[in-house]
């Protein structure tokens, strides 16, 4: 991978006692800094092949997503942020953050 381009993958898991096919709406962001200013960049603006957000995932047990991100010059990633909700419950938003890491 060339400089400022990163491979990524994530797995969305449905953890319920009796899984059924569900529609999950997902948004993902890279939180970081550019020129000393905090920025939150959506994955769909950094990966030209990723559909526009929110992603509508069909999940029974799990769903896998992968691609390549291209960061703007001078951007330093700090965290990855995910926000999702079931399509039938848009007001119940689940959010989680992970520290940025590479080489894992």
Name each model-derived stretch:
Residues 1-104:
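Membrane-proximal structural modules of membrane-associated proteins and complexes
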């Amino acid at each position: 991978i060339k400089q400022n381009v990163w491979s990524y993958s994530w797995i969305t898991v449905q953890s319920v006692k009796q899984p059924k096919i569900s529609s999950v709406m997902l948004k993902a962001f890279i939180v970081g800094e550019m020129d000393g200013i905090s920025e939150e960049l959506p994955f769909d603006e950094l990966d030209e092949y990723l559909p526009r957000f929110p992603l509508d995932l069909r999940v029974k047990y799990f769903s896998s997503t992968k691609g390549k991100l291209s960061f703007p010059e001078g951007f330093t990633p700090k965290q990855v942020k995910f926000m999702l909700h079931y399509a039938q419950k848009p007001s119940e938003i689940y959010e989680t953050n992970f520290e940025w890491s590479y080489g894992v």
